[in-house]
Amino acid sequence: MFEARLVQGSILKKVLEALKDLINEACWDISSGGVNLQSMDSSHVSLVQLTLRSEGFDTYRCDRNLAMGVNLTSMSKILKCAGNEDIITLRAEDNADTLALVFEAPNQEKVSDYEMKLMDLDVEQLGIPEQEYSCVVKMPSGEFARICRDLSHIGDAVVISCAKDGVKFSASGELGNGNIKLSQTSNVDKEEEAVTIEMNEPVQLTFALRYLNFFTKATPLSPTVTLSMSTDVPLVVEYKISDMGHLKYYLAPKIEDEEGS
């Protein structure tokens, strides 16, 4: 039996909004430690890794490990039926072919319950190696979303250049080019408004904006985002989920000679 209750049900709604446009279906690995999801996107370009630790839920019970194949579009449709203030409970029997979702309005006068059919998914787990990064940039998540959106009007790809004093985002296309530079902030009262850069060596990498704009759908989950970069390894875009986990996206850099791709 698996049962998890989340008083702040809006977190689950935001997680599904952040996943559904990138991944159609995925396996939710449920264990006593929490809920994990790892999946390549539909076109096998990027990788998504979600962790929701059991202690972040208000009550959590998992008698034995489960692997639930979920159609994320379907789950997103059901979660749209939950109000932002609703308490959400997920429930499944040990070898069930459905997942129950129960939404309780905070005033307790309305309870909705839905059953979603699960899928049989054949999933290969990819090992994500631990990695030291040359450059780690932490910045307001809304700012990153805006930069990606603005530069996608200029070109298809963004060059991210990271140096000690700041990080620069550049794009070029038929209409011209655009550059946005953020300097490290020294004294900001609110931590979530700061730009911090930890740099071992400078990095300059190119990424497809189409995917970064998918990743920024996770912006409502966290006031800050962390970008971790090294030459020749995938960029990691990480959104912390309050005190219960994280959502990480991995995207390989574009090789310079891939013109027109």
Swiss-Prot record:
Task: Name positions with the PTM N6-acetyllysine.
Answer: K14, K77, K80, K248
Matching entries from Pfam families are given as: PCNA_C, PCNA_N
Q: Where is this cross-link: Glycyl lysine isopeptide (Lys-Gly) (interchain with G-Cter in ubiquitin)?
A: K164
Phosphotyrosine occurs at which residues? Answer: Y211
Give Gene Ontology CC terms.
centrosome; chromatin; cyclin-dependent protein kinase holoenzyme complex; male germ cell nucleus; nuclear body; nuclear lamina; nuclear replication fork; PCNA complex
The disulfides recorded in the entry are: C135-C162
Signal sequence coordinates: none
* Record has Repeat as a keyword: no
Could you provide one GO biological process annotation from this protein's UniProt record? translesion synthesis
The chain's coiled-coil residues are: none
Q: Which SUPFAM superfamilies match?
A: DNA clamp (SSF55979)
Where are the residues linked by the Glycyl lysine isopeptide (Lys-Gly) (interchain with G-Cter in SUMO2) cross-link? K164, K254
> What CDD domains does the database record attribute to this sequence?
PCNA (cd00577)
Q: Which InterPro entries does this UniProt record tie to the protein? A: DNA_clamp_sf (IPR046938), Pr_cel_nuc_antig (IPR000730), Pr_cel_nuc_antig_C (IPR022649), Pr_cel_nuc_antig_CS (IPR022659), Pr_cel_nuc_antig_N (IPR022648)
Instruction: Write out the function statement from the record.
Output: Auxiliary protein of DNA polymerase delta and epsilon, is involved in the control of eukaryotic DNA replication by increasing the polymerase's processibility during elongation of the leading strand. Induces a robust stimulatory effect on the 3'-5' exonuclease and 3'-phosphodiesterase, but not apurinic-apyrimidinic (AP) endonuclease, APEX2 activities. Has to be loaded onto DNA in order to be able to stimulate APEX2.
**Assembly state and interactors?**
Homotrimer. Interacts with p300/EP300; the interaction occurs on chromatin in UV-irradiated damaged cells. Interacts with CREBBP (via transactivation domain and C-terminus); the interaction occurs on chromatin in UV-irradiated damaged cells. Directly interacts with POLD1, POLD3 and POLD4 subunits of the DNA polymerase delta complex, POLD3 being the major interacting partner; the interaction with POLD3 is inhibited by CDKN1A/p21(CIP1). Forms a complex with activator 1 heteropentamer in the presence of ATP. Interacts with EXO1, POLH, POLK, DNMT1, ERCC5, FEN1, CDC6 and POLDIP2.
User: What is the similarity comment for this entry?
Assistant: Belongs to the PCNA family.
Instruction: Please report the name of this protein according to its UniProt entry.
Output: Proliferating cell nuclear antigen
Organism expressing this protein natively: Cricetulus griseus (Chinese hamster)
Upper lineage: Eukaryota, Metazoa, Chordata, Craniata, Vertebrata
